[in-house]
Curated annotation (Swiss-Prot):
Source species, domain of life: Eukaryota
Family of the protein in this entry: Belongs to the protein kinase superfamily. Ser/Thr protein kinase family.
Pfam families linked to this entry: PK_Tyr_Ser-Thr
Phosphothreonine, modified sites: T445
Name listed for the protein in its UniProt record: Serine/threonine-protein kinase STY17
The encoding gene: STY17
Listed result of changing T445A: Loss of autophosphorylation and enzyme activation
Active site (record annotation): D413
Coiled-coil residues: none
PROSITE patterns associated with the record: ACT, PROTEIN_KINASE_DOM, PROTEIN_KINASE_ST
Organism expressing this protein natively: Arabidopsis thaliana (Mouse-ear cress)
Length: 570
């Protein structure tokens, strides 16, 4: 059973997108330096707030409640924006007014690291465009400047377009007015998905995004968008207000997407003593807690902890939900995970043992996977796959996913962190907290998962089906091939923007086997209808394994397929 750690990035949980982790001494020093410079600029500019008693302490409190990344990214030349963030976070404390937001027009430059790239300043069209942008008034840059991430996204698309003639012909960001929208509200699960969905409803394209969570449970989300035809902001503000009111006026049964508007402190009081799991009367999953022995903590996340232990003398993994963090949404996912896993029986899917559905001891028990996750093997232990072992892992995953799809189960969060290895070097699919049984119509609309691995149709909140898992599988294959984190130079939201609007994909190494390159490109097609299903993927992998040759199928005599992982545990 996999569990999300604090450092993972997911749109399903705010805490993992911008988690407040312990700062290093270097980060703390840099935060202090930025704080000092912002304070000095505010005082020198004679802002009214600078005269408030204890303002310097309040400003430091503002920086200290936000992660170090906020201080490192903020444009110190725009000290007034820090005051805006302070004000919004204060207003967000009132349930009657949140979510609160601010809108302003900004100018985004296309220059990359001080170079104009392909932009020719002598081009009359460029000059005309620049004149039309600047004539009326001088616009300020975004709060976080023309950030390295935004520049990286632009450059990455250029590189991608040069390497791939079939790249999506999307327009690169140019020097034109855009709008910066800053939201603040109570911190809630899936908040980022809800905000991006609302912006999408207004026809706005997110070009840059910065998401922060405060240590005391609030959010600060800054989006740079285009798609609004006018530079003025009042019309956009009115449109945002109407969109918020529209969501608030929806019947309770349709308010799954607007939990960020209110924070119900009484939620825990309404939670049932026992979680109801749908049943057909053919099986039992409730475990005998007296037979469950918890031994060693393996991982800890925002909403649960993973332990190693035994159940009836069998070695097991035990995922325990933290009672103080349990809410109605978590109970739905817990119920769904038990409902799906109790029916799953396949050698490439982690085996479900049972669950305790009685509060406060909510837990799920599965077989223990001794070798941990593929994510840890690649990124923590710096393991490397040879081509034959890579294909073996890819085949294991595709078999597990094919079984799930044959049983109308869409995983929705396929990534290396959810792929586990047992003592026999068999890789299995795990973590069904956000998986769903496909509807009779064959399409689904609820968004979830992890942005770096997520299919474009899911990011855009469009109807989707099992082929969304195929896209995620392609990103997993690329990760196995390179050992790198997908789009590591971008934040998760910026990666999502690139995938949807720029046709961005990870760069395939030139030395990759041509058939593997072909498989990757088929699986991450923008159009889901062009992607193969897992039965077809299995056939392609078997053919590729035969082509690679029998001599590479055997394990390394010293370490097996996962020798890098074994070394990491010495």
């Amino acid at each position: 059973m996999a569990i999300k750690e604090e450092t993972e990035e997911s749109c399903g949980s705010r805490a993992v997108v911008a988690s407040i982790t312990k700062e290093s001494p270097r980060q703390h020093r840099m935060k202090l330096e930025v704080y000092g410079e912002v304070l000095q600029r505010i005082q020198e500019s004679n802002y009214e707030e600078a005269n408030f008693p204890g303002f310097d302490d309040l400003l430091w409190l503002h920086f200290n409640r936000l992660p170090a990344r906020y201080a490192l990214d903020v444009n110190v030349e725009r000290a007034e924006d820090v005051l805006t963030h302070q004000r919004l976070l204060k207003l967000a404390e009132d349930p009657a007014t949140r979510p609160v937001f601010e809108v302003r027009c900004v100018q985004v430059s296309p220059t990359l690291n001080g170079n104009s790239g392909d932009v020719d300043p002598s081009d009359p069209a460029v000059n005309e465009d620049a004149q039309s942008s600047y004539n009326s008034r001088s616009l300020a840059p975004p709060t976080f400047g023309s950030s390295p991430n935004f520049e990286a996204l632009t450059q990455a698309y250029k590189d991608h377009a040069q390497d791939d003639d079939s790249a999506v012909n999307a327009q690169l960001p140019n020097s034109r007015p855009m709008h910066e929208i800053t939201f603040s509200t109570i911190d809630r699960p899936k908040l980022l998905s809800q905000l991006t969905s609302m912006l999408g409803e207004l026809g706005l394209n997110i070009q840059e995004a910065h998401a922060f969570s405060t240590a005391d449970g609030f959010s600060l989300d800054v989006f740079v968008v285009d798609g609004w035809s006018q530079e003025e902001t009042e019309g956009l503000k009115d449109a945002l207000k109407k969109e918020i009111r529209k969501f608030k006026d929806q019947p309770c049964s349709k308010q799954k997407s607007i939990t960020f508007f209110e924070h119900d402190k009484s939620t825990n009081e309404l939670l049932p003593a026992c979680v109801e799991i749908p049943t057909d009367g053919t099986d039992e999953w409730e475990i005998d807690m007296k037979q469950l022995k918890i031994e060693k903590k393996v991982a800890c996340g925002s909403y649960g902890e993973l332990f190693r232990g035994t159940y009836c003398s069998q070695e097991v993994a035990i995922k325990i939900l933290k009672p103080e963090r349990v809410n109605a949404e978590m109970l739905r996912e817990f119920s769904q995970e038990v409902y799906i896993m109790r029916k799953v029986r396949h050698k490439n899917v982690v085996q479900f043992i049972g669950a305790c559905t009685r509060s406060p001891n909510l837990c799920i028990v599965t077989e223990f996977m001794t070798r941990g996750s593929i994510y840890d093997f690649l990124h923590k232990h710096k393991g490397v796959f040879k081509i034959q072992s890579l294909l073996k892992v890819a085949l294991d995953v595709s078999k597990g996913m094919n079984y799930l799809h044959q049983n109308n189960i869409i995983h929705r969060d396929l990534k290396t962190a959810n792929l586990l290895m047992d003592e026999h070097e068999v890789v299995k699919v795990a973590d069904f907290g956000v998986a769903r049984v496909q509807t009779e119509s064959g399409v689904m609309t609820a968004e979830t998962g992890t942005y770096r691995w997520m299919a474009p149709e899911v990011i855009e909140h469009k109807p989707y089906d099992h082929r969304a898992d195929v896209f995620s599988y392609a990103i997993v294959l690329w990760e196995l091939l390179t050992g790198e984190l997908p789009y590591s130079y971008l934040t998760p939201l910026q990666a999502a923007v690139g995938v949807v609007q720029k046709g961005l994909r990870p760069k395939i190494p030139k030395e990759t086997h041509p058939k593997l390159t072909e498989l990757l490109e088929k699986c991450w097609q923008q159009d889901p209808a062009l992607r193969p299903n897992f039965a077809e993927i299995i056939e392609m992998l078997n053919q590729l394994i035969r082509e690679v040759g029998d001599d590479e199928r055997h394990k390394d005599k010293h370490g097996g397929y996962f020798s890098g992982l074994k070394k990491g545990h010495r």
